[in-house]
Amino acid sequence: MSFKVSRQTYAELMGPTTGDRIRLADTELMIEIEKDFTTYGEEVKFGGGKVIRDGMGQSQHNHDQVMDTVITNAVIIDHWGIVKADVGLKNGRIAEIGKAGNPDIQPNVTMSIGAATEIIAGENMILTAGGIDSHIHFISPQQAEDAMMNGITTMLGGGTGPAAGTAATTCTPGPWHIHSMLRASDGMVMNTGFYGKGNVSLPTPLEEQILAGACGLKLHEDWGSTYAAIDNCLAVADKYDVQVAVHTDTINEGGYLENTIAAMKDRTIHTFHTEGAGGGHAPDIIAVVGQENVLPSSTNPTRPYTINTLDEHLDMLMVCHHLHANIPEDLAFAESRIRKETIAAEDILQDMGAISMMSSDSQAMGRIGEVVLRTWQTAHKMKIQRGTLQEDTSKNDNFRVKRYIAKYTINPAITHGISHALGSVEVGKYADLVLWRPAFFGVKPSVILKGGMIAASLMGDPNASIPTPQPVHYRYMFGGYGGGIKTSCFTFVSQAALAAGLVDQLKLDKNLIEVKNTRNLRKKDMIHNSATPKMEVDPETYEVRADGQLLTCGAEDVLPMAQRYFLF
């Protein structure tokens, strides 16, 4: 006998279904469910008097035939779609996206629930892949906690702590420092990978860093991003299949943008803070978004362009790059990097999909706990200033949402050779997942999973009789303690380092995963973010044009996902 319920009642009980729409936080972004993998009337839900009980939604199958964990009735937002489904986890990986239940008595079951299965309630929750921040200055280990509590589960970058070199550049220089940081990060509740220093004109100093365990190389102007250094670094990267990230020459001392592009010789490279306020050829580094071999990213202090953006940048820059306000040349260096015209254009290039990634520049002109938040603030600003994208409809912003979520998930994963392991909600990948209440999407996650274990969560008073009494704040859970870190977190290193016996040499607890397939990438491989417009930058007015069109927008004075959610 069937029973008919209203859409509202169904959504309250089982979460939204096909055609239902959800507002993301307090933004103007709306998503619409494209497909529901569950079966009406056969949904699984845990609780007293609910479906997942012995002989009902729970089967008699043994451990090897059932999921370790099922996230029920969740709304998945990923680059490939916006759908509702049950998500099954097995041995720390995503094993199935579909319909969970008891196949002995229920139809359309694609994953079994048994006595060995834990349930995470995903009803009226949004599920995303853990974020990847590929521009980390490892200045303080406490960054990892702030990153995770905004949905970041992987940190790629360089540094050795609060040293002058680390505060300015994302490099972990030399084998001793690389080994030291691999050991030190072994207890961090975070996936990590370290870039070696790429600024040298001969190959052997780079090769020894890759063999020591660097997952990539970083070129930074403060170490000298010369033609010879860029050329040499890319040649070594091609040999060992690791990515190169570059911060180019702001003052055009060793060459201009055209010289840097020539040094690249059409080889794949990741350009950091491509707009230029974070550094790079002044004023036209932003033009590299038109190059097929360049995989460009933004850092979050310029995201999005607001009435406060310019004012805060000068002091940040002086501190981070060891400059002195009483030296005129230092002040001129700083002021040359901060241009409202290129920052405004950056908003639009992000929305066009010409800038492919988002990152933080943590504690070095960027905020590690705001990568996800700033991404969606930018998407909101562009929605209200530029309107609906032509790929979307008046009913939803699904394509725009897929474009923006790819910027901090799948695209940095592809760029840095880790998309075989992480970066999306897809079968076979490690279960680094984040659950959000829609009203808090992008601002404050509810649960963060690492490798299939709950690593962090909002949690109330541990002495209370239930989990919810105040004070409710973020705390590490069991996946963030003891041996849980070993199974739930990973360290990314070069293939050459693994082949050379790094595992036996350092005896790290975390699993080491190789980076691969980084050197044949092109801009077209950046999902939903592959535009290569013809770029022009006026050297006098700093006006930016893409395919002949002037790119400009106003500075916003009010943003969502801001004071409504935070006391401080």
UniProtKB/Swiss-Prot annotation:
Its EC number is 3.5.1.5. GO terms for molecular function: nickel cation binding; urease activity. Gene3D superfamilies: Metal-dependent hydrolases, Urease, subunit C, domain 1. Ni(2+) 2 binds at residues 218, 247, 273. GO terms for biological process: urea catabolic process. Ni(2+) 1 binds at residues 135, 137, 218, 361. GO terms for cellular component: cytoplasm. Its main location: cytoplasm. Residues 130-568 form the Urease domain. It is found in: Cytoplasm. The modification N6-carboxylysine is found at residue 218. Binds 2 nickel ions per subunit. Pathway: Nitrogen metabolism; urea degradation; CO(2) and NH(3) from urea (urease route): step 1/1. InterPro entries: Amidohydro-rel, Metal-dep_hydrolase_composite, Metal_Hydrolase, Urease_alpha_N_dom, Urease_alpha_subunit, Urease_AS, Urease_asu, Urease_asu_c. The active site is at 321 (proton donor). Carboxylation allows a single lysine to coordinate two nickel ions. Substrate binds at residue 220. It comes from the Bacteria. It catalyses: urea + 2 H2O + H(+) = hydrogencarbonate + 2 NH4(+). Its cofactor is Ni cation. Belongs to the metallo-dependent hydrolases superfamily. Urease alpha subunit family. Heterotrimer of UreA (gamma), UreB (beta) and UreC (alpha) subunits. Three heterotrimers associate to form the active enzyme. This is Urease subunit alpha. It comes from Nitrosospira multiformis (strain ATCC 25196 / NCIMB 11849 / C 71). The gene is ureC.
